[in-house]
Design a protein with these regions (language model features):
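Metal-assisted phosphate- and nucleotidyl-transfer catalytic regions
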Residues: 222-225, 311-326, 362-365, 378-381
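Glycine-rich phosphate-binding "P-loop"
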Residues: 189-211, 335-338
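Charged substrate- and nucleic-acid-binding regions of tRNA-handling and nucleotidyl-transfer enzymes
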Residues: 345-427
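Active-site beta-strand/loop microenvironment that shapes enzyme catalytic pockets
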Residues: 215-259
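Catalytic or ion-translocation cores adjacent to nucleophile or general acid/base/metal-coordination motifs
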Residues: 242-304
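N-terminal extension/subdomain marker
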Residues: 1-192, 200, 223-226, 390-404, ...
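Short beta-strand segments
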Residues: 162, 238-239, 275, 385-387
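C-terminal amphipathic alpha-helical segment
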Residues: 276-343
Length: 427
């Protein structure tokens, strides 16, 4: 691997790009989107038809628990082998790709495609790895995904890693330099996904990326941004696709068990293709995810809340404050002197405990203030509207608390998620 990147866990990769006359039919949205909308995936099938497509190389998770999943996986693996044998792909050796993704709202998100060393990724809460999960990893979700990946010849990435680069030193300088790069693709994305353009970095640009990435994890940078010069540096936080990255890690760990240690470094499966995005990219938006409780007695909940957090009170004030709606209790609940970094964390710990003691109470995770207020105001329900987590809170919270509470925030609309376009051999 390129020694210039040794301190970063992020490397140039041998990236495969399709050579097809119908490029618009190749990219397809991340497999973990539209999981309750099979109509979307049927529309994707219709859009692709018989043309070569990444749709033939991934398993939409809407089908993950279906009765024919084993047959689907066999078909995917056969399609990978056929595309490789037919010479469908062009290989870009030891490359990084700069991309500009025009989202459905017209804003442009900037990214960098390369691979990460899975030895430097750990989803365990409290890990000191360079690459960490932002939310808890549900271990039960990994084995079904391992079945999809373990015999696959290729990987196609929908993992998005975030860097905390407020000075915009790593990716943004590339925006004005595309004229000296090799243009790779320029295509619309099916079913309202916007548009994407990609360019191959020059050698000197890769050197600069290596240097600026390394600088982000220096003790000086850690002290300046977080006041944590002695903390284990966090360079990449997983924004999207954590269970996909955890699956890649599990497959690599399984291979290590049957491979001599001296060969681990040469295993293609040791690395995973990802897109890196700056947390401070203007097109990257965080939206809060609210909570609505069903079949709940609001007065009992408030009594339990006060018992759980002595000193909690209605109305605003110092500490963590959440808006409550429903059952004539509209207003604010405040917890002074909270231990968690985020209001979401303070509330979630309580809700988890309360729901264990009251199994009849159900919690749903709701996008949008108006929807949460409408649902929370129905009889028997209670809504909690939570404040938006600032981007600047993400990295310090992961470093201090290990992971964020589940369903803390969402990053954009489903159709603005990564589309599969690039590929890489993992066998």
């Amino acid at each position: 691997m390129d020694q210039r990147f040794e301190q970063t866990a992020f490397y140039p990769a041998d990236i495969l790009l399709p050579q097809t006359a119908e490029m618009k039919k190749w990219p397809v949205v991340a497999c973990d989107q539209f999981t309750s909308q099979p109509d979307y995936w049927q529309a994707a099938e219709a859009a692709v038809g018989e043309a070569p497509s990444a749709l033939r190389l991934v398993l939409p998770e809407v089908y993950l628990n279906g009765p024919d999943v084993d047959k689907r996986i066999e078909t995917i693996n056969a399609s990978m082998d056929r595309y490789l044998a037919d010479g469908l792909f062009r290989t870009l050796p030891d490359s990084l790709i700069y991309l500009e993704r025009t989202q459905s709202d017209g804003r442009v998100r900037h990214g960098l495609i390369g691979c990460v060393d899975l030895e430097q990724y750990d989803f365990t809460p409290g890990s000191g790895a360079l690459i960490r999960a932002t939310e808890g990893t549900v271990l039960e979700r990994i084995p079904p995904r391992v079945r999809v990946r373990e015999h696959a010849a290729l990987e196609l990435p929908h993992v998005m890693l975030l860097i905390d680069d407020p000075q915009r030193s790593v990716i943004e300088p590339l925006t004005g330099e595309t004229g000296v790069m090799e243009a790779l693709y320029d295509t619309d994305l099916m079913l309202g996904g916007g548009h994407v353009k990609g360019w191959r970095l020059t050698d000197s640009q890769m050197s600069r990326v290596a240097n600026t990435l390394s600088a982000l994890k220096s003790p000086e940078a850690m002290a300046d941004k977080y006041g944590m010069a002695d903390a284990a540096p966090l360079l990449f936080a997983v924004g999207d696709g954590n269970h996909s990255l955890a699956t890649a890690k599990a497959c690599y760990e399984n291979l290590k068990k049957v491979t001599p240690p001296e060969r681990w470094a040469s295993l293609p499966a040791r690395y995973a293709l990802v897109e890196v995005v700056n947390l401070h990219d203007d097109a990257l938006t965080f939206e809060p995810i609210h909570r609505v409780l069903f079949h709940v007695d609001g007065r009992d909940l408030w009594d339990a809340f006060q018992a759980f957090y002595p000193g909690a009170h209605t109305g605003g004030g110092e500490g963590h404050t959440a808006e409550v709606c429903g059952q004539g209790m509209d207003g604010l609940w405040t917890v002074p002197h909270p231990k968690a970094q985020l209001t979401m964390g303070t509330l979630q710990v309580f809700l988890d405990a309360y729901c264990r003691d009251h199994p009849e109470v159900q919690v749903d995770y709701i996008h949008g203030d108006d929807v949460a207020r409408k649902l929370g105001s129905r009889p028997g329900n209670l809504g909690f509207l939570l404040p938006l987590m600032g981007k600047e809170q993400l990295f310090p919270t992961v470093m201090a608390d290990g992971v964020l509470p589940r369903k803390t925030f969402s990053m954009g609309e489903a159709r603005d998620k990564r589309y599969y376009l690039e590929a890489r051999r993992i066998r």
